[in-house]
């Protein structure tokens, strides 16, 4: 089949790489570079990013890693060990040790919660915040986790999503960092697509998607190309806006917003390669120091620390100032330099659909959606994208067989 892919973000490129084995594929990307919110920006020798924090939520064992291997990408992903620690009262604790920081009554409550969550024995209709709120520290820790991983507060996160995430965590484990950062993944996807004779067109903005009974068309200012199938890597809302198909039939997906601050430090802030969750910060939910995995992500003699925070109010300046105050407290007298502050919202958010508000990937036999507006259930960030891509690729390959 001839397949057109609109958008060269992680979702679009992963779909293209998988389909390029058996189909003719063409990617249309509006920017001069591919990778969307998952690629590097070189700034003074530091590998900053267009979005992601150089982390893959289930590391070398999750959905994304599996699909990368399946399409022939050689990406080395180093699993974090420990997955994450939690800074409470200035000290870093493993998850299991947090239970000892509260009184006996709260400890029993928290242990019961953890056991119920592991067994899926919880009310699916409530939020994660409601589930945790009877133990103050548990709610703070929950907020740090959802803020870091989903750019949502615990109260904004549906319990149903948390149950699925817990299942994935027990199946695949915690995060990992790809060597070369986000761009390490994107470069390999591009290599595979080109090896399979796929075509990637940059600076090629798509203005229209026309779906007819027997064909589909991708239209720009100076082109109108015919395809058997179109895969859109744009948000469901934008895809609907430029196409002749009604996509959002029920509730609109709700985007999640966030702020990332990149910090240079000679001394380093943490010794491990996992996440440092910061439940006691005013705004920062967590941070990582990716140079503990790959020193090439910063100039010689430096570490790169990336912090993330949910955007809680619409006053972005105030949100950033509170984040900077947190950083000052976290560094506690150590030398550091703020490299870059990025806020993510509107057309360039953390997620086009916050977890629990994603739409389905399959619109009809000719039009499919991939990306973070259509993640699989319980799929954190790029793992959720990979789950959606898997579904689309299976559907298209089945369609090809039956036609
Ligand atoms: C601050 C922050 C931190 C994050 N941290 C992580 C993390 O550590 N780990 C993780 O797994 N995820 C993380 N994420 C989320 C992850 O970066 C995104 O979910 C993912 O990159 C989105 O990929 P996508 O393919 O859905 O969309 P995009 O990357 O947005 O790709 C869509 C592409 O379509 C192109 N496009 C748009 N309109 C048109 C048009 N009309 N014509 C042609 N092309 C068009 C865009 O230019 C873009 O390249 C983070 C996100 C942010 C913002």
List the predicted regions and their residue ranges.
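N-terminal Rossmann-like FAD-binding beta1-loop-alpha1 element of flavoenzymes
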Residues: 2-27
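C-terminal structured subdomain/cap of oxidoreductase catalytic cores
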Residues: 17, 26, 205, 209, ...
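Glycine-rich FAD pyrophosphate-binding loop
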Residues: 20-44
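A conserved beta-strand/loop capping segment in the N-terminal third of enzymes
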Residues: 40-49, 57-110
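Rossmann-like flavin
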Residues: 84-164
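Helical element adjacent to the flavin cofactor pocket in flavoenzyme catalytic cores
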Residues: 165-215
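Mid-domain catalytic core of redox enzymes
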Residues: 208-303, 310-314
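Conserved flavin/dinucleotide-binding core of flavoenzymes
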Residues: 290, 296-403
């Amino acid at each position: 089949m001839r397949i057109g892919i609109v958008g060269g973000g992680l979702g679009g490129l992963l779909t293209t790489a998988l389909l390029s084995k058996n189909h003719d594929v063409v990617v249309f990307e509006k920017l001069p570079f591919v990778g969307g919110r998952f690629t590097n920006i070189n700034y003074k020798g530091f590998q900053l990013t267009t979005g992601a924090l150089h982390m893959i939520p289930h590391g070398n064992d999750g959905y994304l890693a599996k699909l990368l291997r399946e399409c022939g990408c050689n990406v080395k992903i180093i699993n974090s060990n420990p997955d994450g620690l939690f800074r409470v009262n200035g000290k870093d604790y493993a998850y299991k040790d947090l239970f000892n920081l509260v009184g006996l009554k709260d400890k029993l409550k928290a242990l019961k919660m953890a056991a119920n969550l592991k067994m899926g024995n919880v009310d699916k209709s409530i939020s994660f915040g409601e589930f945790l709120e009877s133990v103050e520290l548990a709610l703070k820790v929950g907020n740090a986790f959802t803020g870091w991983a989903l750019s949502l507060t615990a109260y904004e996160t549906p319990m149903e999503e948390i149950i699925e995430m817990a299942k994935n965590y027990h199946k695949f484990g915690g995060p990992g960092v790809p060597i070369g950062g986000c761009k390490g993944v994107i470069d390999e996807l591009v290599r595979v697509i080109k090896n399979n004779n796929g075509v990637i067109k940059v600076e090629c903005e798509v203005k229209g998607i026309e779906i007819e009974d027997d064909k589909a068309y991708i239209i720009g200012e100076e082109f109108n190309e015919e395809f058997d199938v179109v895969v859109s890597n744009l948000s469901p809302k934008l895809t609907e806006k430029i196409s002749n198909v009604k996509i959002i039939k029920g509730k609109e997906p709700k985007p999640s917003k966030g702020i990332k601050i990149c910090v240079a430090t000679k001394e380093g802030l943490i010794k491990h390669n996992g996440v440092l969750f910061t439940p006691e910060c005013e705004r920062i939910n967590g941070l990582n120091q990716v140079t503990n995995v790959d020193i090439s992500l910063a100039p010689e003699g430096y570490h790169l620390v990336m912090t993330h925070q949910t955007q809680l109010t619409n006053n972005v300046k105030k949100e950033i100032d509170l984040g900077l105050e947190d950083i000052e407290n976290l560094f506690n007298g150590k030398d550091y330099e703020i490299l870059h502050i990025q806020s993510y919202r509107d057309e360039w958010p953390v997620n086009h659909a916050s977890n629990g508000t994603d739409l389905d990937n399959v619109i009809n036999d000719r039009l499919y959606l991939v990306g973070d507006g259509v993640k699989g259930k319980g799929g954190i960030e790029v793992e959720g994208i990979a789950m959606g891509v898997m579904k689309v690729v299976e559907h298209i390959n089945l369609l090809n067989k039956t036609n």
